[in-house]
């Protein structure tokens, strides 16, 4: 007796297996899970690598310039504070250097165009 497998059924099964084995397009690297709701996380290196610093509203004054510790910079950041955050190239939040504001609704920036040395969290 000869067994016949329907090609469409086999194709569908193989496609389903391939989709299960492939990570979701928007899946975040494991390091991103370390930045919790209400936090601003800054990583020393691009792509969320290296030492991570975490700030939240309990220890950070709104609309005040917060310099990173002396000699420390960040090249990746995640803003989950719920408020806009401006990242500055200048350690004094001077607008003569590069700066950019990131929305607070879950912004993930794997590679800043400059080394971040300070930030401000805004009211809204």
Predicted regions and their residues:
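Compact beta-sheet-dominated domain cores in extracellular/mature segments
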Residues: 2-124
């Amino acid at each position: 007796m000869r067994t016949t497998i329907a090609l469409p059924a086999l194709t569908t099964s193989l496609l389903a297996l391939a989709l299960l084995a492939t990570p979701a397009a928007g899946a975040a690297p494991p390091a991103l899970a370390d930045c919790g709701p209400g936090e601003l996380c800054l990583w020393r290196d691009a792509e969320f690598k290296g030492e991570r610093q975490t700030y939240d509203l309990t220890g950070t004054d709104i609309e005040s310039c917060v310099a990173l510790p002396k000699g420390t910079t960040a090249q990746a950041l995640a803003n989950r504070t719920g408020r806009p955050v401006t990242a500055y190239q200048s350690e004094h939040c001077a607008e003569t250097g590069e700066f950019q504001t990131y929305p607070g609704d879950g912004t993930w920036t794997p590679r800043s165009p400059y080394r971040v040395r300070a930030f401000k969290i805004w009211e809204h």
